[in-house]
Amino acid sequence: MNLYALQTEINGKENAMLTLLDADTMAQVKNQRAIVGLLKNQKGPITHENILYNPTFIDFFHKTMLVFAEFAAGTNVITSNGFMYVVDERCKTPDKPEQKDIIGSFEVQAGVVLKDTYMANTNYQFISDDGLFKLPAQIERVLFMALV
């Protein structure tokens, strides 16, 4: 997945809009869900702290995680009861992820992932020092296809 910084004007002021779609595709589909956010400081770096995140994108992103439950439903879940964490693939220590690397979690009962129990992690960093979020390939495809 790529991140694009598109220059736009909002209320007469130049802004860098961060999107998951390139300029041509954004012009065609005009999908608000593809806008990750805006840079707070236009001259500053693209970092978690310098982004005003788009609530529409955040909501869409986490709803896409429900698809993860569909993929996980047929897999061996490590725990029989408890929680299964959805961990960003950028994470260098997936066995002991930091809060910033945990996308969210599902409840597990008797080894079954309960789809409707997804809880988003408010500490998750969509963009970190390690770059843009990284999901399993099939989930990234679902996310991208829903945008175009």
Feature-to-residue mapping (PLM):
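The transition from N-terminal targeting/processing segments to the mature protein
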Residues: M1-V148
